[in-house]
């Protein structure tokens, strides 16, 4: 008996769910970037064929820490710097293209450029239709 279904081949972007149905593996990409880079990153992702994302204004710091400002003659330290958090869930085989697009558009070469986190996503459900998997995103 030969199983020639390409969805079961090594490296295939497909998995089976508990019901035995095939679905495309997905990745969640979270990127923390400088606010002024948002439009460039959005455009780069669009050029890579990646549409749809969630954008949040966040604050944080990494190695660059905060900075000192003077307000009404008093000096104070701003510990948390404004950043933008992008979140997108895409098919597994599109993750590398998305990461490269973000790096290409967000990188300035200076401290504070940000981070990208990539993780596996078990499932996604479109609330309106109940559609599941990669077709839901």
Question: Where do the model's predicted regions map?
Answer:
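Positively charged, small/polar-rich N-terminal and surface patches that mediate targeting and assembly
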Residues: 6, 13-137
């Amino acid at each position: 008996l030969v199983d020639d279904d390409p969805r079961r081949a090594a490296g295939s972007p497909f998995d089976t769910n508990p019901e035995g149905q095939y679905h495309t593996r997905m990745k969640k990409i979270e990127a923390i970037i400088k606010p002024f880079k948002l439009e460039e990153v959005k455009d780069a992702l669009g050029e890579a064929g990646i549409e749809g994302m969630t954008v949040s204004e966040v604050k944080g710091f990494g190695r660059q820490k905060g900075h000192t400002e003077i307000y009404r003659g008093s000096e104070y330290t701003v510990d948390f710097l404004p950043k933008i958090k992008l979140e997108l869930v895409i098919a597994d085989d599109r993750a590398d293209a998305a990461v490269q697009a973000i790096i290409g558009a967000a990188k300035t070469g200076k401290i504070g450029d940000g981070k990208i986190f990539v993780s596996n996503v078990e499932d996604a459900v479109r609330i309106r239709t109940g559609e599941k998997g990669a077709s839901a995103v």
